[in-house]
């Protein structure tokens, strides 16, 4: 490369080195009490939240959660970079497990000597050659250090939204400007309650009158009634979820509640995702009942059972994931 331009593209969220990292290394080398708490403090400061850690011989194993980086590869890299700065020299291998909803996503085993050597030269591709990626089943009993998390934990935000109806004999466009309150309550590990509540600020639905005369079950065709009668305070989502990772490559979910604006449901899903393969297979089944038009807690008479088989295929060259689904949908 004869160009004067730096071949590494700068990131907007660049890594900030830890101040006095040499002093932190000395303290971390005294005993595991300081080693674990150093990892907890400095990872948490970078929004990489340590869930568990253990040192065995020359290996430091950590499990972390995060929602800051969209790239899980970058997040794991930031964990490795942080640990490399603050861990004593006796640690030769990092075993880093990414965790989501108390389920293991993947584990990266990193040879520290190779990582440190190539990282300093910005040879990231060479550094990655000595990283082993494996499927993971997050097991708390494997770890010596497990910082206590105080539950429940509540995340929420208020944001604007627009509901739209485009095309039709009543007019080309009808819209509803709304305020939405979104909430996620972590009741405990693996158990969450999702909720979305909204209310109208301004709409022009008064002239929207088009009704459906379909002979098929009205699972979606009553959209006009939902738009008009749900203009005031409506519960768009109120769903309890339980996630599990019973074995490597296998993930499960059980859900119940007001699963969307038109239907309540109870059911579950299973996803088989072989770690080193480019495909995944999912099965889901739900008992669904149609909600009232006001979108509160009432229901209509229509109910059905849905079941889907899903196949996911990832094409690595163009980074495209194809989804094929078949089964019984809401209308049969």
Regions found by a protein language model. Give the residues of each.
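Short flexible/disordered coil segments
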Residues: 112-127, 254-266, 272, 314-324
């Amino acid at each position: 490369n004869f160009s004067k331009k730096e071949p590494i593209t700068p990131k907007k969220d660049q890594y900030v080195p830890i101040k006095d990292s040499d002093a932190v290394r000395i303290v971390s080398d005294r005993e595991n009490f300081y080693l674990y708490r150093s990892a907890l403090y400095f990872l948490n400061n970078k929004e990489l939240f340590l869930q568990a850690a253990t040192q065995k011989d020359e290996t430091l194993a950590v499990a972390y959660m995060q929602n800051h980086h969209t790239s899980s590869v970058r997040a794991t890299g930031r964990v490795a970079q942080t640990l490399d700065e603050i861990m004593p020299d006796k640690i030769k291998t990092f075993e880093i497990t990414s965790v989501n909803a108390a389920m293991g996503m993947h584990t990266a085993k990193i040879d520290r000597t190779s990582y440190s050597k190539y990282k300093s030269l910005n040879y990231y591709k060479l550094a990655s050659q000595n990283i082993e990626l494996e499927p993971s089943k997050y097991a708390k009993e494997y770890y010596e250090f497990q910082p206590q998390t105080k539950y429940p934990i509540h995340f929420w935000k208020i944001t604007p939204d627009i509901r739209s109806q485009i095309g039709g004999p009543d007019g080309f466009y009808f819209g509803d400007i709304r305020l939405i309150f979104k909430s996620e309550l972590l009741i405990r590990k693996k158990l969450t309650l999702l909720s979305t509540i909204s209310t109208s600020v301004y709409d022009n639905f008064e002239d929207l009158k088009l009704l459906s005369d379909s002979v098929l079950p009205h699972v979606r065709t009553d959209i006009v009634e939902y738009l008009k009668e749900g203009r005031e305070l409506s519960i768009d989502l109120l769903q309890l979820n339980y996630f599990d990772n019973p074995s490597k490559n296998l993930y499960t979910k059980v859900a119940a509640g007001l699963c969307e604006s038109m239907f309540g449901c109870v059911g579950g899903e299973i996803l088989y995702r072989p770690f080193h393969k480019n495909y995944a297979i999912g099965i889901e089944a739900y008992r669904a009942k149609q909600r009232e038009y006001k979108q509160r807690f009432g229901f209509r008479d229509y109910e059905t059972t849905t079941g889907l088989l899903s196949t996911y295929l990832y094409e690595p060259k163009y980074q495209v994931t194809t989804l094929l689904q078949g089964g019984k949908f809401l209308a049969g």
